[in-house]
């Protein structure tokens, strides 16, 4: 029997909700803790669903969902959109080399995984080597979990992928698990200013959450005060000037390296 502390790190989206249902139904073992990182940029729909559906369901089986703030637990060097070293934390689009390319993403690790690590260490005295994180990658996302299973933490048993190894599940099957459980359809979790959004998702922020969209515009413009080549939108145009009315596939975008959109 493992002595590791079992931690379900929920992203608040479809795959994470499927794992939640499987835990509640007893098809997955009960974790010791359920946590979710609050980046300060999450779409309001994620918190609305979490508070209305997920949190009460876990409470019924004696589990609390711990919402952990980036502002309180992120490392001082990486709390803002620009790190203290000057590099961007988010995977913005850049025209630095004369054509549109994409920067590396540091936000998921610095604003989610490491934030939860510090909370466990400071609050409970549990170190990274003493816990096993459950992450909600689904079976049809090998680009996201493939590199992870080759890593030291997975090989040391510190990472668990319930929808890959315990109950192999594809995203469309995760949706059915949630529906069969009787929960409403979960939102697609993401930050409202994430460069990985499709135009469909940007348009949703613009129409349904205008205050958040204005915040995204301000951050887009603030980035270029320090880096004139950086843009939030894939067109490498200022966000306020982008036509978001063209049709787009809801699931055409996503992050290949982080723990978002889960």
Language-model-derived ranges and their functions:
Residues 1-262:
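Nucleotide-activated chemistry modules centered on ATP-dependent adenylation/adenylyltransferase
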